[in-house]
């Protein structure tokens, strides 16, 4: 309850807080034409798999190449809807697996808060790996999904082949609090006031898909170098039913609350797989968090993208897909 109260207050009204400004001094992976975006017309398959405790998890696969990538979406509480169509270029020559985390999207909704714990999410990732017969898997985690991938790496480093943290949520609880403060400072008083009203409607049981879209649009506009680039989204922020949308924010807060005062910075030294951490200079997530992730994993590469925010494929698609594909191919050769 204390965590929920604190975070609800943080969403609309946290005071301004400035994180360390990232620079372009970190070398990016070299680009080549083979990594450029291509047609989004790729083979698609979807279905359900059984997660921890019998929970049904919705999945979608793109492509049919021998190399396999598992994508972990952000949130918590959101769905793959903002990623599966937008990251389709990764399916060039490989199979890309997306899944909706428990309690969101098309996966089974969860009534018992205890079933939304970190342990359940990690067990679900293990279920995804087992369902697709992967001895080891390449994880690509975005935002909260990057943090979840970090927790998975802590527990199951031997089951990883490669690790990509795309604009990951901070590896510490204090870093997340700083992130919330930066979002509030960027949003301004009028937007913060409306966000506060929406949060009130959510917990009054009046949330629906349209309200979810408004909330996410207001909040995520602070995540971009240029908010106009939000129009480049091919999928949907809240591409879910009203019932799922109504549970998004409570699910989000429950999952974050279950993490306690997390700190992964000293818990990843045993992770030895090729690792790439991506950070955009305009991201609201503090640069220090991406730096800490890269420093915590031996040999990890930190790629800082100029004039790009939290969703680099929407603001700098050609360098993003080129660089990411270059990393994945080179990692295969190591």
Regions found by a protein language model. Give the residues of each.
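Conserved HGGG/HGGXW glycine-rich cap/lid loop of the alpha/beta-hydrolase fold
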Residues: 51-109
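Conserved acidic catalytic loop of the alpha/beta-hydrolase fold
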Residues: 119-137
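Conserved hydrolase catalytic core segment
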Residues: 135-178
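Flexible "cap/lid" loop of the alpha/beta hydrolase fold
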Residues: 164-201
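Alpha/beta-hydrolase
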Residues: 186, 190-266, 273
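Short beta-strand/loop motif that positions the catalytic acidic residue
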Residues: 271, 277-279
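Conserved alpha/beta-hydrolase "acid-adjacent" motif
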Residues: 284-289
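Catalytic active-site module of serine/aspartate enzymes centered on a nucleophile-bearing elbow/loop
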Residues: 300-334
């Amino acid at each position: 309850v204390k965590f929920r109260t604190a975070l609800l207050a943080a969403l609309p009204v946290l005071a301004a807080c400035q994180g360390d400004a990232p620079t372009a001094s970190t070398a990016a992976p070299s680009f080549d034409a083979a990594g450029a975006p291509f047609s989004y017309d790729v083979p698609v398959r979807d279905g359900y798999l059984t997660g921890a405790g019998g929970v049904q998890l919705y999945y979608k696969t793109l492509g049919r190449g021998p190399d396999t990538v598992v994508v972990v979406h952000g949130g918590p509480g959101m769905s793959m809807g903002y990623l599966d169509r937008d990251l389709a270029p990764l399916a060039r020559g490989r199979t890309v697996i997306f899944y909706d985390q428990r309690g969101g999207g098309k996966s089974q909704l969860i009534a018992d808060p205890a079933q939304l714990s970190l342990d359940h999410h990690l067990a679900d990732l293990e279920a995804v790996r087992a369902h697709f017969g992967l001895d080891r898997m390449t994880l690509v985690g975005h935002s909260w999904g990057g943090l979840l991938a970090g927790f998975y790496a802590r527990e199951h480093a031997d089951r990883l082949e490669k690790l990509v943290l795309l604009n990951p949520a901070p590896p510490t609880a204090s870093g997340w609090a700083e992130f919330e403060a930066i979002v509030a400072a960027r949003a301004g008083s009028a937007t913060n006031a409306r966000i506060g009203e929406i949060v009130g409607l959510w917990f009054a049981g009046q949330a629906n898909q349209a309200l979810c879209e408004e909330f996410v649009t207001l909040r995520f506009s602070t995540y971009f170098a240029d908010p106009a680039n939000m129009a480049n989204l091919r999928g949907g922020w809240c591409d879910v039913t009203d019932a799922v949308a109504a549970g998004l924010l409570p699910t989000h807060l429950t999952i974050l609350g279950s993490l306690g005062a997390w700190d992964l910075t000293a818990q990843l030294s045993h992770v030895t797989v090729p690792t790439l951490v991506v950070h955009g200079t305009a991201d609201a997530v503090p640069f220090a968090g991406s730096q800490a992730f890269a420093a915590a994993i031996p040999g990890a590469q930190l790629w800082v993208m100029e004039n790009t925010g939290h969703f680099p494929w929407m603001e700098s698609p050609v360098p993003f897909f080129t660089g990411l594909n270059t990393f994945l191919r080179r990692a295969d050769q190591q």
